[in-house]
Amino acid sequence: HAYTSIYLVEKGLAQNVVAMDVAEGPLKSARKNIDSFGLGERIETRLSDGMTALVPGETDAAIIAGMGGLLVIDILRRGMNVWQSGYELILSPQSEIPEVRRFLRENGAKIIDEHMMQEDGKYYNIIKAVSYDEKQSIYNDENTADATEEAGIDTKSSVPVVIGDNYGEKLIEKKSPVLRQYLVERLEKLSGIYCRLSKETGERVVDRMAEVSQESREIETVLELLK
């Protein structure tokens, strides 16, 4: 409904915005809201499947939110020609968050900040990432070291890569109290699941118990890092 676009322009955070949706219905609502604020000259609406309606170089940042992580990844993968070096990505996937972090890491985008919040019993993650260097891996390519330093991007971290993918390197580094709360709740839930599984039998039960134990150990590791 273009609420974010309107907010960005009204607060002076963006000069111009392109608000896009894959369906015409939401775009009609967006246009109505944009017109009611008198921002029709600064906010353009486009029918677009992901980032396909954007021309490379036309924008310098994108916000993708309100959908599952796999769809976010699909949009990013198909729109790689748009998010070139220095492009800013603000992402808020509703699921598959570790997969989104991993995709960014493996496709030349560095997560430079992440926030986690809770509202009405639900947790939300907001990831800020910057792309650069023609999609080369910033973690494995020595040739990107100078470029990342010039961009002010720190690629060094004491957080193991897998842990960072699964739980958020930046959240751990800033010792996020919301992440801690989520993990304590998750650990308690896993304990209950393990207890119930221990009373059942079968090969699948054994495999599931191993998965629960592995996740519990990871969470305990992260909780130690959050102290």
What residue ranges belong to the model's regions?
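Short helix-capping segments at alpha-helix termini
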Residues: K11-L13, D35-G40, N81-W83
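An accessory alpha-helical subdomain
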Residues: Y132-K227
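Short loop/edge segments at beta-strand edges and connector loops
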Residues: L47-D49, P93, D113
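Conserved SAM-binding loop of SAM-dependent methyltransferases across substrates and taxa
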Residues: H1-Q15
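Conserved beta-strand signature within the Rossmann-like core of class I S-adenosyl-L-methionine
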Residues: W83-P98
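Active-site segment flanking the S-adenosylmethionine/decSAM binding pocket
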Residues: T52-M80
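Active-site capping/gating segments
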Residues: V18, A23, E96-P98, E106-Q136, ...
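S-adenosyl-L-methionine
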Residues: M20-D60
